[in-house]
Every structure is written in C-alpha cells, then in structure tokens.
C-alpha cells in the first residue's frame, strides 16, 4: 500500500518525507486556503520535496475550464496529478486528460457507481471519502470493498485512493479491504507506528542493557 500525505505544509511534508515512507501528497482548495500562499508556488515546492504523485485540484466547475486549469497545473512538474471533482463535467474533463496522458485523481466519491464511471473515464486514481461517509452513518469501508470488487471484475487500472482518513484504524481497514493508496493528515502518521507496549518494551530493554555495562560500538 502507498501512503500519501494530505497537506500543504511544506515543512511538515519535508520532515515526514525524510522517513522514506511517504509516496505522494494530496492537496485541496481548503488546504491551499489555509496555507495562505499562492497555489502554484505551493504545488511546485511540494513537487521538489516529494518525487511521487502530487495531487493539485482544479477550482473550475465546467469541463472546458477544468481542462484549461488542469493543463496549466500539469505543467508545474511531471509528477503533478490533476485532481477533479466527481461531477458530469469532471468526468468529461477526466476523459480528455486521459487522452492527453495527464494523470488524474477524481475526488469526492461517495458511491460505487461514481467510481465505475471514473474508471470508465480513465481516472488514474479514485478518491472515496471514508470519514465523511462515517460522519453520515455509513460504513466507508463498504464503499472501498464495492469499488475493489467492481474494478477487479472488469480489470480497471484506476487505483483506489482512500481519502478523508481520520485515524490509524481507517488505514488498517483500508489496507485490509484492498485500497491501493491511503492519504492521511500528518497527525495520523505517528499513530501508525506508536504503541504504548512498544514504548514499555523498549524502556525495559534499555534498562536491562544498561545494567550489563556493555557497548556495541
């Protein structure tokens, strides 16, 4: 499974990317707005930090305008993935980008049929929103299961990118049901490796080692 960061904080991205465990980055208009910086500048900087896929979202709502914006975003760097909403116009734009061999991330997916159409339109990634579905009383993992089954049935190459991930349990469950990628807020990253029993065990090991008076170096 690939792990992406959902962030526009370049300092945090650089820090976590230094672990070698971050495969890409996703952004959205809300995160760009919170950064208080010009979008193109932020995306270019992230692309320099992380060589993997960097999702940059269009702000337009019509197919022609999405295509124009996406073409501009794609010119920032070779690893830019154009992020587009799962609307009728978004699907039209997605198909156009596929013809131009521009990678796409179709976002705001909440149903299996939406994911089916995105795959038919040639999407590189489909982003089902797990946490958002949970907020409304649905099981977001059921959506990933259904999408996985549909894509496997017909051999679609569109990758499932689990989004709106809130915690380590979401990451675990997404991995179990077959998501190809998960994008997480930076705060969730440490939750993936921290465990109180690990800390307790390490504390005991270090105490026992110190009692030997030995040194490996």
Curated annotation (Swiss-Prot):
The keyword Cytoplasm applies. The keyword Signal does not apply. Its main location: cytoplasm. It is found in: Cytoplasm. SUPFAM superfamilies: Aldolase. Pathway: Carbohydrate degradation; pentose phosphate pathway; D-glyceraldehyde 3-phosphate and beta-D-fructose 6-phosphate from D-ribose 5-phosphate and D-xylulose 5-phosphate (non-oxidative stage): step 2/3. GO terms for biological process: carbohydrate metabolic process; pentose-phosphate shunt. Keywords: Cytoplasm, Pentose shunt, Schiff base, Transferase. Transmembrane segments: none annotated. GO terms for cellular component: cytoplasm. One of its GO terms (molecular function) is aldehyde-lyase activity. The active site is at residue 83. It catalyses: D-sedoheptulose 7-phosphate + D-glyceraldehyde 3-phosphate = D-erythrose 4-phosphate + beta-D-fructose 6-phosphate. Its EC number is 2.2.1.2. PANTHER family: FRUCTOSE-6-PHOSPHATE ALDOLASE 1-RELATED, TRANSALDOLASE. Belongs to the transaldolase family. Type 3B subfamily. HAMAP family: Transaldolase_3b (MF_00494). Transaldolase is important for the balance of metabolites in the pentose-phosphate pathway. This is Probable transaldolase.
């Amino acid at each position: 499974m690939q792990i992406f960061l959902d962030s526009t904080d370049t300092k945090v991205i650089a820090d976590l990317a230094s672990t070698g465990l971050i495969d890409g980055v996703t952004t959205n208009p809300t995160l760009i707005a919170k950064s208080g910086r010009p979008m193109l500048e932020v995306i270019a900087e992230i692309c320099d930090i992380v060589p993997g896929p960097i999702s940059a979202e269009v702000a337009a709502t019509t197919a022609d305008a999405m295509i124009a914006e996406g073409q501009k975003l794609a010119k920032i760097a070779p690893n830019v993935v154009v992020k587009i909403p799962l609307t009728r116009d978004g699907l039209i734009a997605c198909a156009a980008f596929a013809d131009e061999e521009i990678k796409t991330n179709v976002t705001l997916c909440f149903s299996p049929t939406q994911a089916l159409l995105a795959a038919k339109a040639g999407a590189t990634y489909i982003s089902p929103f797990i946490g958002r579905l949970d907020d409304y009383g649905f099981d977001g993992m059921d959506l990933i299961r259904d999408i996985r089954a549909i894509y496997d049935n017909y051999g679609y190459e569109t990758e499932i990118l689990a989004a709106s991930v809130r915690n380590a349990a979401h990451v675990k469950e997404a991995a179990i049901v077959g998501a190809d990628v998960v994008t997480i807020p930076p705060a969730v990253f440490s939750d993936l490796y921290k465990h109180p029993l690990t800390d307790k065990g390490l504390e005991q090991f270090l105490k026992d080692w110190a009692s030997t008076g030995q040194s490996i170096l």
